C-alpha cells in the first residue's frame, strides 16, 4: 500500500495557464479561492435554480430546486470535511498525511464538488437522461454493433453501421454508438467544466466531481474490484484524453476515484434523503403524521435506544410538544435534520478515516454510508419511503412523463441537423444560413454560441483527410445536440417545446 500523502493528490495546477513554482500555504489557498469564484459565478450554477430536484416545474419557492439542494449538500460536505480534519488532528495524523498546510484546500475542494455535483443534469432529472438515451438508442442500436452478421445492424446512421473489412473503423463505430447512448449527468458535468465552459479549474477540483470511473463507451461486465465505482458512466469519449491527463496529475490508477469524492457522495446521500421527505409534506403529498407512520412501519420493531428512536421518534416527540411556537412541520424537519446529521456525519467521517488506505488509493469499492450499520439502514429507510410514497405519486409521475415527452420531442425537432450530410452541415456551420436548407438554418441559429463553438473547435482539431473524420464529426454533432438540450432549464425546455410544436406563440 502506497504511503498516504495528500500533497500528491491535492494538485493545485491547472490544464491551461497553470501557476508556476513552489507555493506557500496562503498562495495555494488563494488558487482554490479562485476555483470557488469561477464555480459560483458560472452560468451552470445559476441554471440549477430552474432545474428539478423531485418536483418538475414547481412554482412553490419553498420546494427545493437543484440549486437549493446543492447548497445544502455543500454545507453537509463542509461539515463532514471539518469532522474528518478535526479527528485527524486529535490523532496527530494531519502532518503524517501531508494535510497540515492543506486543510483549507481540503475543505474547499469538498464544498465546491458538492455545489457542482448536479451541474450536468438535464431538464427533468433522470427522466431527461432516459429520454436522451432512449432517443439515441432507437437510432443507433448499439447492441447490434456486437452482433453478426453485419446485415442485422439496425443502425439508422449509415456512416456508423459496421462494414466488412474495416475493423479499426468498426471499433470506433462501436465506441461512438455506445457512448452517445449513455448520456449521464455526472459525465456531462465533466464535459461542462472542461470542454463547454472552459473553467480551467485545478486538477484536484475536477477530480472531486469524477464520481464514476467507467467510460461511457464501456461494453460488457465491469471488474468486480471496481463494480461500485463503475456502476454508471463517468466521462465521454470526447473527454478521454483530458481524463487520462487528470489521472496522471492526481496519481490515480485506471478506474480509481479521487479520495475527496467519497465525502461529496456521502453529503449528497444525507441531504437528499431528508429533503425529499420534507418537500413531499410541503407539496401535501402526505401529512406529517402519515409520513411518521410510513417511517415507523417501514423500520419495524425497535428498542428505545435504537437509531430510529434517537433520530425519528425524538424529532416526532419534540415537534409535538411545540416548545418553539413554530409549525409542527417546521419543527419536525428541523429536529429530524439535526438528529440525522449528528449521527451520520461523524459516522461518515470515521468511515473515511478507517478506510483511508483504500480511499487514498481510489479503490474503496463502496459508498461511505453503504454498509451493515444502523446509519446505513436509516438512509435506506428514508430512500425507501420516498420511492414508495413520493416518487410513485400520480402528480410526480405525470410530470415526469411530460418531461420525458418534452425532451424526446425537442430531440425530434432538431433531428434534421443530424440528417444533413457532412458537406452540407459543414457548409451550414461556415455560412450559418443556407438557402436550400431553410429549416436546418433556423434550427442551427437556435443553438447556443458556446455549444456551437465547442463543436467547431473539436472538429477543427481532427485531420480532415483521415478515414475517421466523418465518424468523429458526426459524433461531435450529436454531442452538440445533447449539450444544447441537456443545458436547458426545465422551464426553458417546456416553453421551447410548446413554441416549436406551435402549441403557443
Curated annotation (Swiss-Prot):
Its cofactor is Mg(2+). HAMAP family: dGTPase_type1 (MF_00030). Optimum pH is 8.2. InterPro entries: dGTP_triP_hydro_central_sf, dGTPase, dGTPase-like, dNTPase_1, HD/PDEase_dom, HD_domain. It holds the Pfam family HD. Inhibited by the action of reducing agents such as dithiothreitol and 2-mercaptoethanol. It comes from Shigella boydii. This is Deoxyguanosinetriphosphate triphosphohydrolase. Keywords: Hydrolase, Magnesium. dGTPase preferentially hydrolyzes dGTP over the other canonical NTPs. NCBIfam families: dGTP_triPase (TIGR01353), PRK04926.1 (NF003429). The gene is dgt. It is an enzyme of class 3 (hydrolase). Belongs to the dGTPase family. Type 1 subfamily. Its EC number is 3.1.5.1.
